[in-house]
Regions:
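Class I SAM-dependent methyltransferase SAM/SAH-binding core
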Residues: 252-276
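Conserved SAM-binding loop of SAM-dependent methyltransferases across substrates and taxa
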Residues: 242-252
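Conserved class I S-adenosyl-L-methionine
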Residues: 232-241
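Class I SAM-dependent methyltransferase Rossmann-like catalytic core
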Residues: 200-215
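The feature marks non-catalytic terminal segments
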Residues: 2, 43-54, 65-71, 113-195
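Conserved beta-strand signature within the Rossmann-like core of class I S-adenosyl-L-methionine
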Residues: 318-330
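Conserved alpha-helix/loop element of class I SAM-dependent methyltransferases that forms part
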Residues: 212-230
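Active-site beta-strand->loop->alpha-helix modules in alpha/beta enzyme cores, enriched
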Residues: 1-116
Length: 382
């Protein structure tokens, strides 16, 4: 059996797959996604020699390094396999380094039905249930550290979050898991909250099945209704995603204008709530720039995480704004702004859901959900 190790950059083979390279009885092929290079390590070659052969492929930091796509990777995999038995090792689709996560997803799609094992890799937010754990002995760890110190010094010094090498990214135990197509896609989408890839699957944050999310949403609806009953006028929900909150509000009797700029999310929102809510494509910035959608209140529920200027609220055509955020983000962003602004006052603050640990992606991983605090802002005469 040929071991095919598909990585973004050459150093990844030593950092995340040293235990694979150490299986000297197997022929091992390393595929570098950023350059398309293929390194063949014959069976019987000791680990030290294999690392020496890998070292010249280590490149300078390149922020443009990216997966070449499943089609290009499939060609490399087929060349390496040569029609014989092979297994593929690659990055986790949920690797926090998105360049690696994308390559891991693409490589699995390129495997052609061969067995695939994903390295857990860099995962500061998720704890994984792995299928194969390989603790390195002291000699293995020493070999990994020596490779980094000799050939990756620039990666120890770089400011690039995608490519920097730190203690937590140099694993003494290499952990791997197998995943089917749906699980891979859900893992990839879960870590994509800041980009368009979050919409590649339905319900990426598992609102429909999460007890934590159900409690948060139900409590949020009750909180809104306690201050702004359904007959108060329409609500404008900004960043409605697929409508988990929208449908609850409609069921409570509210008239809802739900806005969602992501086309895929908006399509699902319309399918789920379009018969009962009015759907709009504007972002918060667009709503503030052209305040043509008045409401009894605006809802900014779990969406001020992406660097938006809180000053945009000044231009929204409503005197009440409901905001919900996790406690740390609330303390770091909204609270200081609220202390400075003369235009808004805090009319209410209450916990909506307590922090909890929860399994995700069918139990493949779990994470800490940090709780949510609701803050009602009322416009002042300032």
């Amino acid at each position: 059996v040929i071991d095919i190790v598909a990585v973004l950059r050459a150093e990844d083979a030593a950092l995340d797959f040293l235990s694979v390279l150490g299986e000297e009885q197997h022929e091992t092929h390393i595929l570098c996604g950023d350059t398309g290079e293929r390194l063949v390590l014959p069976a019987g070659r000791p680990l030290a020699d294999r690392l020496d052969a890998l070292a010249p492929l280590v490149r300078p930091v390149d922020e443009d390094a990216a997966s070449p796509g499943a089609e290009a990777l499939a060609a490399l995999v087929e060349t390496s396999a040569g029609g014989g038995p092979a297994r593929l090792w690659t990055h986790s689709p949920a690797d926090t380094r998105r360049s690696r996560g994308r390559l891991g997803r693409d490589a699995a799609d390129a495997a052609g039905g061969r067995p695939v094992l994903h390295a857990v890799g860099h995962s500061p937010y998720l704890q994984f249930i792995s299928d194969l754990d390989r603790p390195l002995d002291r000699a293995g760890v020493a070999a990994k550290l020596a490779f980094v110190n000799r050939h990756c010094g620039h990666l120890l010094r770089t400011a690039s979050e995608e490519h920097v090498v730190r203690t937590g990214r140099v694993h003494a135990t290499e952990r791997f898991f197998a995943a089917g197509p749906e699980e891979r896609e859900r893992l990839f989408a879960l870590l994509a909250s800041l980009d368009e890839d979050a919409a590649t699957v339905d319900d990426p944050w598992e609102f429909a099945t999460s007890a934590y999310e159900a409690e948060r949403l139900d409590t949020t609806v009750a909180w809104i209704a306690s201050h702004c009953p359904p007959d108060s006028g329409p609500l404008v929900e900004v960043g409605a995603c697929e409508g988990a909150l929208t449908t609850r509000l409609v069921d409570k009797g509210f008239t809802v204008h739900a806005t969602e700029p992501n086309a895929a999310f908006r399509h699902r929102l319309a399918a789920r709530a379009g018969g009962a809510a009015r759907i709009h494509p504007e972002s918060l910035e667009e709503l503030a720039a052209r305040p043509a959608l008045p409401g009894a209140a605006y809802l900014l529920i779990e969406m001020l995480y992406y660097g938006q200027d809180p000053g945009l609220l000044d231009r929204l055509p409503a005197d009440l704004v409901f905001v919900a955020l996790e406690p740390e983000t609330l303390a770091a962003t909204l609270t200081p702004w609220l202390q400075r602004t003369p235009h808004w006052e805090k009319a209410d603050e209450r916990p909506l859901v307590a922090p909890a640990l929860e399994a995700v992606c069918g139990g493949r991983a779990y994470l800490s959900k940090r709780g949510s605090i609701g803050v009602l802002l009322r416009r002042t005469g300032g």
